[in-house]
């Protein structure tokens, strides 16, 4: 493996011949990041971080700025595409055992957390009704921290409630964090290319490698083209598909929406939070739903790396996928039966998958007579 990183990244990188389409999502994520930074810059030029003007400045961008509507929709829907790609990317890592490359996995999960923080701050910026109340509910979870909670919340808000200082600092954070994401992405790619990608069989690919360019670069380009086509179809014909109707009204602290919920890509974590009636317990479960991903490399006990030849793990993996979808759906519903029970069952199943990894590994070793 050559150690000239710049050359290695562009073309000379030796890659296994048998990596499938599931390995394309890294380059798609890089494209999403570039798109978000570019559209975000043009939006920031016209945006005003003031509670009296923020909502009006978004209307000004969509109505008066040339192609402002396209920039705004590309940025909002691009965020959804970003999360679709990152969730598939993580699912592929779980299925094919990519997490055994520990440094790459750890940097990737850190990237996910940074991305989620950036997206949350961005959701608050339009200062719509749902933006305001989602920010109030989520930041208010800090008060669940014993002793420090109230002080931390006041410090984050810049006052005793969400107000102008909160919006200003959220805009500053939303602007600066993408640069942290770019730095972490570079680190992620360098760490990956130290060891090299895994492959669907989980075998050592050193005996059969080909240059990344032109073989895999053209394969990446196909899916990239399809993603951009899909993105522009949504932007052109269904621009409000991911928007909440409440967010078309300006934030009003005196009127609470009937059902407060964040963007769809946070709903699985929000569903886990809501499934626990205790505030501190819910906040801990919310944090653990992401943090548990850090533990996976240390829980792998199977002798085979991917799930390709491990039927029990496959069953649990697809249960996790269906659980993720179900909990996302349940979190869009009001807090009433049967949705409370569905959320609690799916939250339990979600954590069961991660806790069952070592047990399933041992069982599969026994089934295959591997000592």
Swiss-Prot record:
A single GO molecular function, which one?
metal ion binding
Annotated residues that bind heme b b566 are located at 89, 188
Alphabetically list the UniProt keywords. Answer: Electron transport, Heme, Iron, Membrane, Metal-binding, Mitochondrion, Mitochondrion inner membrane, Respiratory chain, Transmembrane, Transmembrane helix, Transport, Ubiquinone
Segments passing through the bilayer: 25-45, 69-90, 105-125, 170-190, 218-238, 280-300, 312-332, 339-358
Any Gene Ontology biological process: mitochondrial electron transport, ubiquinol to cytochrome c
Entry similarity comment: Belongs to the cytochrome b family.
Query: What's the miscellaneous note?
Result: Heme 1 (or BL or b562) is low-potential and absorbs at about 562 nm, and heme 2 (or BH or b566) is high-potential and absorbs at about 566 nm.
Subunit details for this protein?
The cytochrome bc1 complex contains 3 respiratory subunits (MT-CYB, CYC1 and UQCRFS1), 2 core proteins (UQCRC1 and UQCRC2) and probably 6 low-molecular weight proteins.
Show the PANTHER family listed in the entry.
CYTOCHROME B (PTHR19271:SF16)
Q: What is this protein called?
A: Cytochrome b
Origin organism of this chain?
Answer: Simalia amethistina
């Amino acid at each position: 493996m050559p150690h000239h990183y710049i050359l290695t990244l562009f073309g000379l990188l030796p890659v296994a011949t048998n990596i499938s389409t599931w390995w394309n999502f890294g380059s798609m994520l890089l494209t999403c990041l570039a798109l978000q930074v570019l559209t975000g810059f043009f939006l920031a030029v016209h945006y005003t971080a003031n509670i009296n003007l923020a909502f009006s400045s978004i209307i000004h961008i969509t109505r008066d700025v040339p192609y402002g509507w396209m920039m705004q929709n590309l940025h909002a829907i691009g965020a959804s595409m970003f999360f679709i790609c990152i969730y598939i990317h993580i699912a592929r890592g779980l299925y094919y055992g990519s997490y055994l490359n520990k440094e790459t996995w750890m940097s990737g999960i850190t990237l996910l957390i940074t991305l989620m923080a950036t997206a949350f701050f961005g959701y608050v910026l339009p200062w719509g009704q749902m933006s305001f109340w989602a920010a109030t509910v989520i930041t208010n979870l800090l008060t669940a921290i014993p002793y420090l909670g109230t002080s931390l919340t006041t410090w984050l808000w810049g006052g005793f409630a969400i107000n102008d200082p909160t919006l200003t600092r959220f805009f500053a954070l939303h602007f600066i964090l993408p640069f942290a994401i770019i730095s972490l992405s570079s680190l992620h790619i360098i760490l990956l290319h130290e060891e090299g990608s895994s492959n669907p069989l989980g075998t050592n690919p050193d005996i059969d490698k080909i240059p990344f360019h032109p073989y895999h670069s053209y394969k990446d380009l196909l899916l990239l083209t399809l993603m951009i086509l899909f993105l522009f179809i949504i932007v052109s014909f269904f621009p409000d598909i991911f928007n909440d109707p409440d967010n078309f009204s300006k934030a009003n602290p005196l009127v609470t929406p009937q059902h407060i919920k964040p963007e769809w890509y946070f709903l699985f974590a929000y569903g886990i939070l809501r499934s626990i009636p205790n505030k501190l317990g819910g906040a801990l479960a919310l944090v653990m739903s992401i943090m548990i991903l850090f533990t996976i490399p240390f829980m792998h006990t199977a002798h085979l790396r991917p799930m390709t030849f491990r039927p029990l793990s496959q069953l649990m993996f697809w249960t996790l996928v269906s659980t993720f979808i179900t909990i996302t759906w349940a979190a869009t519903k009001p807090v009433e039966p049967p949705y409370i029970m569905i959320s609690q069952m799916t939250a339990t199943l979600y954590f069961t998958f991660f806790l069952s990894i070592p047990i399933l590994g041992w069982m599969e070793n026994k089934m295959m007579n591997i000592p």
